[in-house]
A protein has these predicted regions:
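C-terminal transmembrane helix and the adjacent membrane-cytosol boundary/short C-terminal tail
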Residues: 2-18, 187-202, 271-301
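Interhelical loop and adjacent transmembrane-helix boundary motif
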Residues: 8, 13, 20-31, 69-78, ...
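N-terminal signal-anchor/first transmembrane alpha helix
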Residues: 13-53, 116, 120
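Periplasmic/extracellular loop-to-transmembrane helix junction in inner-membrane transport proteins
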Residues: 29, 33, 56-94, 159-160, ...
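Transmembrane alpha-helices
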Residues: 36-45, 94, 120, 124, ...
Length: 301
């Protein structure tokens, strides 16, 4: 009996062959590369190759050098467009956060039919075309639109206000369009917060405001950072809404690129603006990523 046990023990403890696991790992990696190869080729042919060619054009035409970039930074009109884009994107992110955080808290704290209803209210606008939603704002803000008609009917104004083709119109519409992209990440982060933590803080005598600032908000910061990053980067390159509600007097970087490429056929200058927008978006993404890592380190400590 003891002899059989002594013989079986080394056999049971024998390690699995290493060569077989390595082969399986190599086959798995090769299969993964084979599966994503068509996607890489498609992206390379339809995205990276045209972008690379456009960026090279910005350095080589009309003459080799940085003339297109110097024009972007030296002419007041284009510098104003750059500043306006940053301002509207920042304001849109702030307003989306202020409006979206309470909605995300309601979605995370309430279950059942209310949570389903709130989620549908957030998701349904995403299923509607951005063009349709932007045209809806045109109807609301135009000279004979809903707001001016309501104000004039009550005698609050004597003549229609100029609401359309302004920075405010672009900001309101972009906040409305991008709001779901702020709500969903924050709601996901809030749902991951253990419900016992706020309850424990309340039982220890903390006020609801103190619980929010000390417990709920810090634990939801990953969702806040993710939502702010998505909204800000999308706002930087937004085209449809600024083109419809801003007009030629409220240009942003994306609409300026469209104007230079489609109307003026100035592809080198459009490529220069595109590179600036791309570098700006990548820089902001890297910054938010580092902030998120720092926040996780602080939370862990």
């Amino acid at each position: 009996m003891s002899t059989s046990t002594e013989i079986d023990a080394p056999l049971a403890a024998a390690p699995a062959p290493v060569g077989g696991s390595r082969r399986r790992g190599q086959l798995s990696r090769r299969l993964s590369l084979l599966l994503i190869a068509p996607l890489i080729l498609l992206l390379g042919w339809t995205f990276f190759l045209p972008i690379t060619r456009l960026l090279l054009t910005s350095f080589t035409e009309p003459v080799f050098g940085f003339s297109n970039y110097e024009r972007l930074w030296t002419e007041p009109l284009y510098l104003q467009v750059f500043i306006r884009t940053l301002w509207i994107a920042s304001a849109c992110t702030v307003f989306a956060l202020i409006l979206g955080y309470p909605v995300a808290m309601l979605m995370a704290r309430h279950g059942g039919k209310f949570a389903i209803f709130a989620t549908m209210c957030v998701l349904i606008p995403l299923w509607t075309s951005v063009l349709v939603r932007s045209y809806a704002w045109v109807i609301v803000l135009e000279r004979n639109g809903l707001i001016n008609s309501w104000l004039m009917a009550r005698g609050l104004i004597s003549q229609p206000l100029k609401l359309l083709y302004t920075n405010g119109a672009v900001l309101m519409a972009m906040t409305h369009v991008l709001l779901p992209f702020m709500v969903l990440p924050i709601a996901t982060a809030l749902k991951s917060v253990p419900p016992d933590l706020p309850k424990a803080a309340l039982n220890l005598g903390a006020s609801r405001l103190r619980v929010f600032w000390s417990v709920t908000l810090p634990l939801s910061l990953p969702g806040v950072f993710a939502g702010c990053l998505i909204v800000f980067v999308m706002a930087l390159g937004f085209y449809v809404t600024p083109a419809l509600l801003g007009g030629p007097r409220t240009l942003m970087l994306a609409t300026l690129i469209g104007q230079q490429a489609i109307e003026l056929l100035n592809w080198p200058f459009a490529g220069a603006i595109s590179l600036v927008l791309l570098v700006l978006s990548l820089g902001i993404t890297v910054t938010f990523k580092r902030l998120l890592k720092l926040d996780r380190v602080v939370a862990h400590d």
